[in-house]
Amino acid sequence: MTKKLALKRKGKDAEPTNEVVASSEASENEEEEEDLLQAVKDPGEDSTDDEGIDQEYHSDSSEELQFESDEEGNYLGRKQSSSAEEDEESSDEDDDEEEGSSDEEGEEDEEKDSKSKQADDKPSSSGAASKKAPTTELSKRDTSKPEYQDSDTSDEEDIRNTVGNIPMHWYDEYKHIGYDWDAKKIIKPPQGDQIDEFLRKIEDPDFWRTVKDPLTGQDVRLTDEDIALIKRIVSGRIPNKDHEEYEPWIEWFTSEVEKMPIKNVPDHKRSFLPSVSEKKRVSRMVHALKMGWMKTTEEVEREKQAKRGPKFYMLWETDTSREHMRRIHDPVSAPKRDLPGHAESYNPPPEYLFDAKETKEWLKLKDEPHKRKLHFMPQKFKSLREVPAYSRYLRERFLRCLDLYLCPRAKRVKLNIDAEYLIPKLPSPRDLQPFPTVESMVYRGHTDLVRSVSVEPKGEYLVSGSDDKTVKIWEIATGRCIRTIETDEVVRCVAWCPNPKLSIIAVATGNRLLLVNPKVGDKVLVKKTDDLLAEAPSQDVIESERIKTAVQWSNAEADEQEKGVRVVITHFKPIRQVTWHGRGDYLATVMPEGANRSALIHQLSKRRSQIPFSKSKGLIQFVLFHPVKPCFFVATQHNIRIYDLVKQELVKKLLTNSKWISGMSIHPKGDNLLVSTYDKKMLWFDLDLSTKPYQTMRLHRNAVRSVAFHLRYPLFASGSDDQAVIVSHGMVYNDLLQNPLIVPLKKLQTHEKRDEFGVLDVNWHPVQPWIFSTGADSTIRLYT
C-alpha cells in the first residue's frame, strides 16, 4: 500500500496534467512505464550537448526529491526517505479500498517503484556537471479531456510558489524566491552574467522560444501550441483555431414581435353607454353646489391659506418700508447736457471760427460725424436778431430722448492711471542702428507721377515706371539714367526678376505685360536672358478657351525689340500690379476689373498661364507669393486669403477690419505679414498666432500707399499721402514664445504734395539699409 501511494505521488509530480491508467495486463503497464520514463534523460551521458534537454522542476514539497544548490550554484537531486509514520497513516486510510487488489497489481507496483528509483538516480549524478539554468517545457494539455476535469477551475492550477500576486522584485535581496505548499523556501536558480546570456543566444537553438517564469525564476520553453496561440493573438485572430467564427445562425427564438390580444371577446353594449351610478353622483354634487352645501376647490384652498396665516413676516423692519422696496434701487439720474461754450455763441471770438483748412477737414468727415470735434460749424452774426432758426433742433431733441430711455445708466469709478504706465518701454533708436536717417540722392527725369520702383537683385541698378508712359533704368551709385523705354500707356507697376541669374524686368502698362531685357550689368547674363526669351517652347498642354480669351503670349515686334522688349503678354483688362515668385520662373498679375479672372499666374519657362480661381470673392487688390512655402496671398478690399497652390485649397482667412487694402509685404521668413490700408493704418499679422492683426499701427495722417520689408535687416517702411516715409524696426525672433518687437525709428518727409498724392511706393535696397521712395512730385529719393 505504501508503494502504491509513492508511485501515485511520483506520477503527479512528473506529469501534473496527464494520468496513467493501469490496465490489467502486465505487458501494457510495462510499455506505459517506459513511455513515462522517457521524459527523464541522463544528462551525465554527454555533458557537452545537454543544452536542449528538457528538465523538470520539483519544489521542496516533493516527498521523494529535494533540490539544493552546490558551491557552483547547480541543483542536485537526492532521495529523501519518507517517514514510516506518514506512510502508515496514509496506508491506514486506504487499507479498506486496497484489500480487494490482486497479487498481480502488487508485482506491477514493485516494477514501477524500481524503475522510478532508477530514473530519479540519474539526474542526481550528473546535476553537478551541468552549469546551465534549468529549463522546463510547458506541459501539453490533453485536448481529449474536458477542460476542468483535473480541478474545479482554471485558476486553481498547480502553482508551486505560493507567494501570491505580489511584485517579485521584493525577493531581489534574498536567496530564495518564495515558498512552496509546505512553507519551505524555493531557492533561486543560478543567474548567469552577460557572457552566459550571449553564449545561450548563440548555442541554444530554443533560446528564442524560452521565457522566464517570474514566480519560480525558471526558464520555460514554449511549445509549438503556445507559439501558434501567440501568433494567432498577435495577428488579431481567435485564439482557438477549432472555433468556427462564422457558423450558421440558428434562430432559436423568433426576432419578430407577435402581438396577440389576451382576450378576443366582443365589447358589451353597456360599455358604450354612460354609467348610471356616475350620473346620479354628478347630479347630487350639482345640487349640493347650488344649495351651498359643497364648496369648490378654490374656496377650500383659500380657507386653508387663511387658517395657516402669513408664511413670511418682517423680522427687524416695519411695514412702512414696503413702499420703498417697490421703487427702483438706487436710481441714477440722467446726465445733464454740457453747457454751451464760446464756440456756440452768435458772436464768437475770431480764434473759434474755422479757417479754410479746418472747414475742409470738417466737411471731409461727413460720413463719420462722430469723429468731428464739434457737431456744428461756428458762425458769427452782428446781432442776435440776425441769428436764423436752428435747423438741427428737432433732431437733437429726438436723439436726447433716445439717450434718456434707451441707454442704460451706470455709475463708473474713475481710475486714476498714470499715462507713463500705459506707454510700453521700447529700446532707444540709437541701439537699433543701422537704419536710413537722411536723404542722400534725388533721381529726377520723369515728368509725371512715379508709381512704382524696383531694385536689381545685386543692388546696382534701379528701374522706375511713371504716368509719363516711360520706364527708366538708373544707376544707383551715380544717379545717372542709363536707359529710357517708352510705352504706349501709363506704367502702373514694374518688378525686377529676383533670380540673379536672369536679367528681366516685368512692366505692366495698360493691358500688356512687357518682359524687358534692360541690357545692363553682366553681358553673359544679358545674352543668356535673350536666349531664354528668344524661342517659345512647345506646348504640351492644350489651353482652355477661358485662358485664351484672358491672356495671350507673343514675341515683341521689331521696334520694341530694339528697346529691349522680348515678350508681350496681352491681358483682357488693365493690369494694376505684377509680382515675381522667389525663384524667378513664375509671376502673377492683378486686374481688378477682371471679375473671377482678376488674378493670373504666368510661367516664364513654358510660356503658359493659369487662372487659379473660378469664382470671385471680392475685388482683388494685391497678390503675393510666399517666400518659402507654395502659398499664394490674395488681398481683396477687406480680407486676405491664403491658398495652398499644391493642395488647391484655402488655408487661412485674415480679418483686417479695414475699409480698403492698398498693399502687402511678407517677412523673408514667411511667418509675418504687413498690410497697408487707405484708412491710415498698418496691420501686422502673425500667421502662427491668429487671423486677427497682432498690432495695428496708426503712424500716418493720410492713406498708406505702400509697405515693404527689408530682406536682410529687421526693418520695414511705409509710404503715405502725407509725404512721409516712416522707417520702423521689426525684429522677429526664432523663439515662438517671444512676440515680435516693433519700434518706430525715423520719419523721412522730403517729398512734395501734388493733387492730394504723396509717396506712392517704397522699396528697400537688397543689401544695404537704404530705402527708395517714389512720389507724386515726379522724383525718386534715396534715404541712407
UniProtKB/Swiss-Prot annotation:
It comes from Drosophila yakuba (Fruit fly). SUPFAM superfamilies: WD40 repeat-like. It comes from the Eukaryota. Residues 1-159 are annotated as: Disordered. Coiled coil: none annotated. WD repeats lie at residues 445-486, 488-526, 570-612, 615-653, 656-695, 699-738, 754-784. Residues 1-11 have a biased composition (Basic residues). Residues 124-133 have a biased composition (Low complexity). One of its GO terms (cellular component) is preribosome, large subunit precursor. One of its GO terms (molecular function) is ribonucleoprotein complex binding. GO terms for biological process: maturation of 5.8S rRNA from tricistronic rRNA transcript (SSU-rRNA, 5.8S rRNA, LSU-rRNA); maturation of LSU-rRNA from tricistronic rRNA transcript (SSU-rRNA, 5.8S rRNA, LSU-rRNA); regulation of hemocyte proliferation. Required for maturation of ribosomal RNAs and formation of the large ribosomal subunit. Keywords: Nucleus, Repeat, Ribosome biogenesis, rRNA processing, WD repeat. Its main location: nucleus. InterPro entries: BOP1/Erb1 (IPR028598), BOP1_N_dom (IPR012953), WD40/YVTN_repeat-like_dom_sf (IPR015943), WD40_repeat_CS (IPR019775), WD40_repeat_dom_sf (IPR036322), WD40_rpt (IPR001680). Belongs to the WD repeat BOP1/ERB1 family. It is found in: Nucleus, Nucleolus; Nucleus, Nucleoplasm. Residues 27-36, 45-54, 62-73, 84-111, 149-158 have a biased composition (Acidic residues). PROSITE patterns: WD_REPEATS_1, WD_REPEATS_2, WD_REPEATS_REGION. Residues 112-123, 138-148 have a biased composition (Basic and acidic residues). Pfam families: BOP1NT, WD40. This is Ribosome biogenesis protein BOP1 homolog.
